[in-house]
Amino acid sequence: MIIDTHVHIGTGLGFHMTEEDVIYSINKYNIDYALVSNTEAASHDHQRKLIPCELQKTQLQCLERAVGFARENKGRIGIMHWVKPMEDITPELRNMIENNLDIIKALKFHPYHASCSFTSEESKKYIHLAEEYNLPVVSHTGTGYDDNPMRLFEMAKRYPRTNFVMVHLGLGSDNKEAIDLCAKAQNLYGDTTWVSTASALEFINKCGDDRLLFGSDSPIDGKDTYLNNGRGDRSLYQEYFNEFREVVSAETYEKIMWRNASELFNISLK
């Protein structure tokens, strides 16, 4: 079994990722369940410039699209709601979350594309919201200040009852700082999105095998992201499907590829 904890839909930021692409990819590559977030909730572009208001969507609009997708594919698709920290938490948003807690499995942050630090007051109000609904908090991490792994570590220590997932383990880094931080906080998880299998093994050695989750960013490189990257080279994820399972125990492999996610996000696979 495989649970992919990092899948997208959405048009913008140079990407066009459709519901059809997601269904195609999980069917073709034997993904049993995918956690999906809607990238259209990004408020800033790749240069961290504000996207014109007329081109943005509210987080409620983004969540509505994700909910529709998950409802049409219940049992295979769950939601990580991509929050816009600069927006208020409205009664409508609360109602949408409360009415869909069976498919909303986490709140998702992207400090880079929100141009907002994960430790900001704006972000904290959504961490409180996650705590209120007992939802894990998932966040992109990179090498800047706002999205640095240290910011997640700081929040994990401040909110010990909430579980946090450090996506990418510091994208663009050697992952060592992120892994060391995860070793210091039992409520801090990592994922494999663009993380080498060598770093995954280092994570297991330092943190154990209970807090690493399989994730991919699919279909960011097209509907065959699991097979090859945007240049046509063999995908990193082929290593996770093949070579990686040969260098860890069967129990560890199951934990990383689906069991840890099933427990953290309360996902029941039949």
What are these regions (language model features)?
Residues I3-V7, A34-V36, I77-H81, K105-F109, ...:
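Hydrophobic faces of well-ordered beta-strands that scaffold small-molecule active sites
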Residues K49-V138, K184, L188-Y189:
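Active-site gating/metal-coordination segments in enzymes
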Residues Y29-Q56, L101-I104, T162, S218-G222, ...:
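Active-site gating loops and adjacent loop-to-helix segments of metal-dependent hydrolytic enzymes
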Residues M1-Q61:
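An N-terminally biased module of ancient metal coordination in phosphate/nucleic-acid-related enzymes
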